[in-house]
């Protein structure tokens, strides 16, 4: 069946286009709390609800609309987590200036392969740009979330992707500072905590240095 302009809006105006902030929010749905990893996606319904609320998928439709017909919920959740883990690994790699893991790259490439296909379509005025979907709705949603990070790499801005230097945080963020030296996802929280920790360490070290040293034991006479 030929596509028509009324059925497919131009991709650049598509209301499900994601931003880099959306991608990072997706990556940060797994985080450290009190030293333990906490996954906001405990079930597929959790993941699907997040995708719908974020606008990756049509609002007004429940998680069932995102559930692939050929897999169960556990497999669908595993797919979401696998793409998220792969994108996080890529973010960590570029943040630390190291090559990304080959398996992670393969996972991301599988995700973006499901991106909608851009097409020329008939319109009342002659022709316009439309799109058609390649994968199932979940594939398409994950492709949309992967796309902004891939775009930053292609645009040569991957060196601004950071992982928070706070070992109890590790959020992924984009460094928009003028000098490109930002280390914390948020200076008011992680940055200040790090400064406070360094201050406590200096005070402790200073107090240790000022402790009186025990007197050396008196020399005892040795027998002839």
Residue ranges and their predicted role:
Residues 1-163, 170, 208-224:
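Short helix-coil boundary/hinge micro-motifs
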Residues 26, 173-174, 199:
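Aromatic side chains
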Residues 37, 174, 195:
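Short acidic, gly/pro-rich beta-turn/loop elements at beta-sheet edges
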Residues 156-159, 176, 191:
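Residue-level signal for short amphipathic helical patches enriched in basic/charged
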Residues 161-166, 182, 187, 193:
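Residues immediately within or flanking Cys/His clusters that coordinate Zn2+
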Residues 175-182:
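Short linker/helix segments within small regulatory modules
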Residues 188-209:
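Basic DNA-binding region of bZIP-type proteins
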């Amino acid at each position: 069946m030929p596509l028509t302009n009324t059925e497919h809006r131009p991709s650049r105006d598509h209301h499900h286009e994601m931003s880099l902030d959306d991608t990072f929010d997706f990556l940060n749905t797994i985080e450290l709390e009190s030293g333990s990893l906490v996954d906001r996606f405990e079930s597929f319904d959790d993941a699907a609800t997040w995708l719908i609320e974020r606008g990756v998928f049509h609002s007004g439709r429940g998680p069932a609309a995102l559930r692939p017909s050929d897999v169960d919920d556990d497999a669908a959740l595993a797919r979401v987590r696998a793409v998220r883990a792969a994108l996080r690994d890529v973010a960590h790699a570029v943040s630390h200036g190291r090559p990304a893991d080959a398996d992670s790259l393969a996972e991301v490439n599988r995700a973006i392969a499901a991106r909608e296909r851009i097409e020329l379509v008939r319109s009342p005025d002659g022709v316009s740009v439309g799109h058609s979907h390649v994968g199932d709705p979940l594939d398409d949603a994950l492709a949309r979330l992967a796309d902004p990070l891939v775009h930053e790499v292609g645009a040569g801005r991957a060196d601004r992707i950071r992982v928070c230097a706070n070992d109890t945080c590790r959020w992924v963020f984009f460094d928009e500072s003028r000098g490109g030296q930002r280390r914390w996802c948020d200076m008011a929280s992680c940055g200040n905590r790090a400064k406070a920790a360094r201050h406590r360490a200096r005070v402790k070290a200073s107090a240790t240095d000022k402790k009186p040293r025990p007197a050396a034991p008196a020399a005892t006479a040795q027998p002839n």
